[in-house]
């Protein structure tokens, strides 16, 4: 009996030893790859601390720096951001084969406080990540925090509610970056990267005198050109920027800010319309159709004219590039319903859905929300007008190109009825109409007409009436 007890005692001791050894080696392993959170003081801003997440592991290493402002809401969010970057990196490296490479996977995140004032602080994170392959990847991530709102800001938040800020930023960015010949070499990429979409302008910093925009590698130019940035003078945006982000006292930096590398101090020259010269508005319905619509856009560009395209939501969803090109080249986009029904035969609810769904898809693709609507067949009533809250744009000249598919017939009908201040209706989905439009655009230009959008035409009429 005693021998059995001794035997079980020895077994128990052995088990404890094994468990202890396992625990020792397990703890030793954790210690070796422990994530350390170091804290030190920022050299520029004494009230800001720098926290660092570090791991110097066998197969990967990372160092993630982030600022601590002693502002609970902001600090919590920045800490979550840093930890999320680490978790994402660990997830991405989990299954990477390290047997055939001597280079460890790496994540390095550093930051710079580019602006710190009473109103806001702007933090730009620079992230380098290497996970196998020939090269690592570098990206920028920005945070703008409003102390009065106690909230982080998106690009939407800094502009006035009804401001068409995306188109203004798009216009400025495109023309500024195009001044660099190397960037201008790939015009299609530049246009895509500066198109009026929120995601193209999501990396920004509110500074003392500027709104600085950042563009990642490959966004607007070939990879070898790297990241790009432009800093737009706030004075150029004063008509659309919210007052609290312009106020000198509130936006005065705690230290002297560095002068930006690429400063924008003047707006690109926009073509103006002379109200004393003949004007005519070409309008195109039922598109887009890439083949024929782009043909018309080519002619407008060649003769430095503009037009208004009343598009169908059902077609826009399939041809977003054509829609973006329309806007990028200074043309106007209007709403022509989703699927071209006679709106007055629908219930008000159904008719509004046709319009609103089209508004939404246009805005989703381009960032632009039309102000003009052209009801199919011109069918409209007072109730719909009041409910839509959009300007209704009809026409003066209809060559019935949808019925008579003959280029000469279409050209003759338009030219015979063309006149100063008139609006022409053509459909951009037919080849014969596109061919006719080429000739019409040339002839009208030769006759001294300025080819304008519907909105420009209305503005000219107002200017003339005011005289």
UniProtKB/Swiss-Prot annotation:
InterPro entries for the chain: DUF3298, Glyco_hydro/deAcase_b/a-brl, NODB_dom, PdaC, PdaC/RsiV-like_sf, Peptidoglycan_deacetylase, Polysacc_deacetylase_ArnD
Regulation of its activity: Activated by divalent metal cations; Mn(2+) is the most efficient, followed by Ca(2+) and Mg(2+). In contrast to PgdA from S.pneumoniae, these ions are not absolutely required for deacetylase activity.
Keywords: Cell membrane, Hydrolase, Membrane, Metal-binding, Transmembrane, Transmembrane helix
GO-annotated cellular components: plasma membrane
PROSITE patterns, sorted: NODB
Subcellular location: Cell membrane
Main location as per UniProt: membrane
Matching CDD domains: CE4_SpPgdA_BsYjeA_like
Induction or repression: Negatively regulated by the two-component system YycFG.
GO BP annotations, alphabetical order: carbohydrate metabolic process
Record site feature (Raises pKa of active site His), residues: 401
Membrane topology, record value: Single-pass membrane protein
Pfam families in UniProt: DUF3298 (PF11738), PdaC (PF13739), Polysacc_deac_1 (PF01522)
GO MF annotation list: hydrolase activity, acting on carbon-nitrogen (but not peptide) bonds; metal ion binding
Disruption phenotype: Cells lacking this gene show sensitivity to lysosyme, in contrast to wild-type.
EC number: 3.5.1.-
All residue ranges annotated as the NodB homology domain in the record: 278-452
Binding-site list for a divalent metal cation: 286, 336, 340
Active site as annotated: 285, 427
Superkingdom in the source lineage: Bacteria
Family: In the N-terminal section; belongs to the RsiV family.
Cross-referenced PANTHER family: CHITIN DEACETYLASE 1-RELATED, GLYCOSYL TRANSFERASE-RELATED
Note in the entry: The product of deacetylated GlcNAc4 by PdaC is GlcNAc-GlcNAc-GlcN-GlcNAc.
Described function: Catalyzes the deacetylation of N-acetylmuramic acid (MurNAc) residues in peptidoglycan, a modification that confers resistance to lysosyme. Is not able to deacetylate N-acetylglucosamine (GlcNAc) residues in peptidoglycan, but can deacylate chitin oligomers such as GlcNAc4 and GlcNAc5. Is essentially not active toward chitosan (partially deacetylated GlcNAc polymer) and has very low activity toward chitin (GlcNAc polymer). Does not deacetylate GlcNAc.
Protein name, per record: Peptidoglycan-N-acetylmuramic acid deacetylase PdaC
Source organism (scientific name): Bacillus subtilis (strain 168)
Lineage: Bacteria, Bacillati, Bacillota, Bacilli, Bacillales
């Amino acid at each position: 009996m005693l021998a059995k007890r001794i035997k079980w005692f020895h077994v128990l001791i052995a088990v404890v030893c094994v468990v202890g050894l396992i625990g020792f080696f397990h703890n030793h392993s954790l210690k070796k790859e422990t994530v350390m959170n170091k804290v030190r003081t920022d050299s520029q801003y004494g009230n800001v601390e720098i926290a660092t997440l570090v791991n110097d592991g066998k197969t990967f290493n990372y160092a993630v720096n982030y600022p601590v402002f002693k502002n609970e809401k902001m600090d919590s969010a920045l800490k979550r951001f840093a930890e999320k970057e680490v978790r994402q990196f660990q997830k991405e490296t989990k299954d990477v084969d390290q047997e055939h490479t001597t280079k460890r996977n790496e994540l390095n995140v550093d930051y710079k406080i580019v602006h710190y004032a009473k109103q806001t602080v702007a933090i730009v994170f620079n992230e380098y990540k290497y996970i196998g392959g020939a090269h690592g990847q570098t990206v920028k991530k920005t945070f703008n925090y409003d102390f009065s709102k106690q909230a982080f800001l998106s690009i939407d938040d800094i502009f006035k509610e009804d401001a068409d800020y995306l188109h203004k930023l798009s216009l400025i960015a495109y023309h500024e970056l195009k001044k660099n010949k190397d960037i201008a070499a790939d015009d299609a990429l530049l246009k895509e990267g500066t198109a009026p979409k929120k995601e193209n302008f999501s990396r920004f910093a509110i500074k003392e005198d500027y709104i600085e925009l950042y563009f990642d590698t490959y966004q607007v130019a070939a990879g070898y050109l790297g990241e790009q940035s432009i800093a737009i003078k706030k004075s150029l945006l004063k008509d659309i920027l919210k007052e609290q982000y312009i106020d000198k006292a509130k936006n005065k930096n705690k230290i002297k800010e560095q002068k930006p590398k690429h400063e924008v101090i003047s707006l690109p020259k926009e073509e103006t319309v002379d109200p004393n010269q003949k004007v005519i508005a070409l309008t195109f319905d039922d598109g887009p159709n890439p083949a024929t619509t782009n043909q018309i856009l080519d002619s407008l560009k060649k003769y430095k004219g503009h037009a208004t395209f009343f598009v169908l939501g059902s077609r826009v969803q399939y041809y977003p590039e054509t829609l973006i090109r329309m806007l990028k080249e200074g043309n106007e986009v209007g709403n022509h319903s989703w699927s071209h029904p006679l709106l007055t035969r629908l219930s008000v609810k159904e008719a509004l859905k046709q319009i609103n769904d089209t508004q939404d898809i246009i805005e989703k693709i381009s960032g632009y929300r039309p102000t003009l609507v052209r009801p199919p067949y011109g069918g409209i009533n007072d109730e719909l007008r009041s409910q839509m809250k959009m300007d209704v744009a009809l026409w003066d000249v209809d060559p019935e190109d949808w019925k008579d598919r003959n280029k000469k017939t279409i050209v003759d009908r338009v030219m015979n009825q063309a006149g100063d201040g008139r609006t022409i209706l053509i459909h951009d989905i037919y080849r014969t109409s596109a061919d006719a439009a080429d000739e019409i655009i040339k002839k009208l230009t030769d006759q001294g007409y300025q080819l304008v959008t519907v909105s420009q035409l209305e503005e000219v009429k107002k200017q003339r009436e005011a005289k």
